[in-house]
Amino acid sequence: SACNTIEYIGIETYNPAEITFPKNVDKVLIVNNAVPQPDDVGYTYNLYGTVQDTARAHADSALYDACHSLGKSIVDVSFFNDVLLYHDGTRQDTKYLVDEKLTPETVKELCRETGTDAVISLDRLLFRMEKDVVAFAEGFVVGGVDIEITGVVRGYLPGRDNPLATVYVQDSVFWSESADNMELLKLYLPSPDEALRAAGQYIGRKVTPNFVP
């Protein structure tokens, strides 16, 4: 059998960012202003044709991962002098479907507290995950995980009544594996929590070009 090796050659190209921050913005703060969806919302697990009513997936870590991934991707571009990740979520309510903007007072206080010039905030992030496992007569099983991601990310400047810009995000990620039995399939496919975290990391990277060239 023949083996082909694919070589990737890195070429640095810079396109204009979708959102232009003022030249005096030197340090930015990444903030999680989204509320995680409940564990029993947005996840459907279909096992051998039967929907499992005990399916649960935790989205709180995925929100953190999205912010962390966004911050790291911005750092890698070396556009701003410094990028900070705020240690706490900013919302205390449970209204996960509500897209709630940061208030001008909150933006001003966050920048004052952290010594930053602007805020990039994840204001909403929702996941819809479907997992399907099918058994074949030949004795093997096939499983797939499909996640649809929707979100809202905004740029804020202290002293402004309205956000600098709003980015609406919609994307998806997918895994598909086959195995001789169910136990092996579990090793190949990510767990529900792992899949959501991977989706969060992915969407954080995907949003980055909106804010940096």
What function would you assign to each model-found segment?
Residues 4-25, 154-213:
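C-terminal/domain-edge helix-coil "capping" segments
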Residues 13-14, 100-107, 133-140:
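N-terminal post-signal-peptidase region of extra-cytosolic proteins
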Residues 24-27, 39, 115-118, 145-151:
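Envelope-exposed proteins and targeting segments
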Residues 34-121, 125, 160-165:
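N-terminal segment of the mature soluble domain
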Residues 41-57, 135-144, 179-186:
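Glycine- and small hydrophobic-rich membrane-insertion segments that are intrinsically disordered
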Residues 123-179:
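Amphipathic beta-strand/beta-sheet edge segments enriched in Tyr/Trp
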